Amino acid sequence: MPVGKLVFNQSEPTEFVFRAFTTATEFQVLLFLLFLLLYLMILCGNTAIIWVVCTHSTLRTPMYFFLSNLSFLELCYTTVVVPLMLSNILGAQKPISLAGCGAQMFFFVTLGSTDCFLLAIMAYDRYVAICHPLHYTLIMTRELCTQMLGGALGLALFPSLQLTALIFTLPFCGHHQEINHFLCDVPPVLRLACADIRVHQAVLYVVSILVLTIPFLLICVSYVFITCAILSIRSAEGRRRAFSTCSFHLTVVLLQYGCCSLVYLRPRSSTSEDEDSQIALVYTFVTPLLNPLLYSLRNKDVKGALRSAIIRKAASDAN
């Protein structure tokens, strides 16, 4: 599908506006402050992870390599959505051009898909570390880690580009359509098309299965082997700590994949239109906030590196 047709499918330009969360001014201010606080926490938490991994040689292992890239994805992922969302909460609705909507959709889908593939890669990394500890450094080489990360981005990039191009070659009715969402996501934009969208829905389901179902199954298989390995640990304290870590990781995975599946894989209905934007808040704010907390900030190595970095920074400022 030629990308050049992305914006020129109409004889006249079309723009979209996002439906407001609420028209009550006091609630607008409250929502703005809440989402701004969550966004700043996401920025601080994920930036801290990237900084500490890049500045401490002891954390330059495959696990922390993937964690830092996950944090970078979360930063980009939320930044594509949240600033525009915040600007629309307060004041009058601001229209977004067809090209701007297409760009936001492309980056949102690409980064979100890469995130899903990366979570599967991280589960495989943990499987190798726990089930094959003696061969971990031989298997998880720097070259393999880089190739897997590039593969995740490539697998996300191609279908995202094709899906976005396919959607924005559709005709849209009128020149000032309202999107029943806080971002240019695929399902709400598809509903605005003035054409038969059954083929586009089928493509969306195929892409969703590729991005959501397959990585989730790989994660489940990895954790089945990890669980079997944990059960063989003789120390009760060791088993408890391992299960505690795995349960937190699986909580984030189930939350992200479950919410995304509800939006992209369930049949379309009139009730799902309003529910989609509410569910999307979970994987826009909650999982990007939980990932640095549960994957890294609970880790003793990361906390120790952060503590030593802060002490060194304070000492250098004092001198």
Curated annotation (Swiss-Prot):
The keyword Metal-binding does not apply. It is a multi-pass membrane protein. Its main location: membrane. Residues 1-29, 80-103, 165-202, 264-276 are extracellular. The chain crosses the membrane at residues 30-50, 59-79, 104-124, 144-164, 203-222, 243-263, 277-297. It is found in: Cell membrane. Odorant receptor. Belongs to the G-protein coupled receptor 1 family. This is Olfactory receptor 10Q1. It comes from Homo sapiens. The gene is OR10Q1.
